[in-house]
């Protein structure tokens, strides 16, 4: 991921045109590491949209809505991360489970569609079952 981000910079893309999204704040460490590996600086997104010149925006998928970047990396699309296992374990009935799956799938979709020109989606094996939906 760090090399991929570095390649975008080498192509002349400004750092603030890059976004890195994860499922939840628990994976932000992985996003920071990817940005650092590219010798770049990150700014963590919050509920207030704060794109900062010269910095790669990182944040949880739910913060991606309404944003656009020339290049986006969606990382940590691991089987136990998306759908978020904690949400699945807390489901009381089948209808709620379907809602959880739909919400989780929608979060991934929103994060991926923030990319205008370049998209990289990564995960470790076993990867999220939702990645097949992107093909």
Regions found by a protein language model. Name each.
Residues 1-42, 47-50, 64, 100:
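Helicase P-loop NTPase motor core
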Residues 49, 125-126:
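Conserved beta-strand edge residues that scaffold enzyme active sites
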Residues 129-135:
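A conserved SF2-helicase RecA2
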Residues 14-16, 29, 59-124, 132:
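Conserved helicase C-terminal RecA-like lobe
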Residues 56:
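Short, conserved active-site loop motifs that form the nucleotide-linked donor/cofactor pocket
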């Amino acid at each position: 991921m760090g090399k991929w981000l570095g390649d975008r910079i080498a192509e002349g893309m400004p750092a603030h045109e890059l976004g890195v999204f994860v499922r939840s704040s628990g994976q932000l460490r992985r996003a920071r590491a990817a940005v650092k590996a590219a010798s770049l600086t990150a700014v963590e997104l919050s509920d207030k949209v704060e794109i900062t010149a010269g910095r790669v925006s990182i944040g949880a998928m739910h913060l991606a809505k309404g944003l656009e970047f020339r290049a986006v990396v969606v990382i940590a699309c691991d089987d136990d991360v998306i759908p978020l296992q904690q949400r699945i374990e807390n489901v009381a009935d089948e209808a709620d489970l379907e809602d959880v799956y739909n919400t989780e799938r929608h979060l991934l979709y929103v994060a991926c569609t923030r990319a205008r020109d370049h998209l990289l989606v990564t995960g470790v094996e076993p990867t999220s079952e939702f990645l097949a939906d992107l093909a």
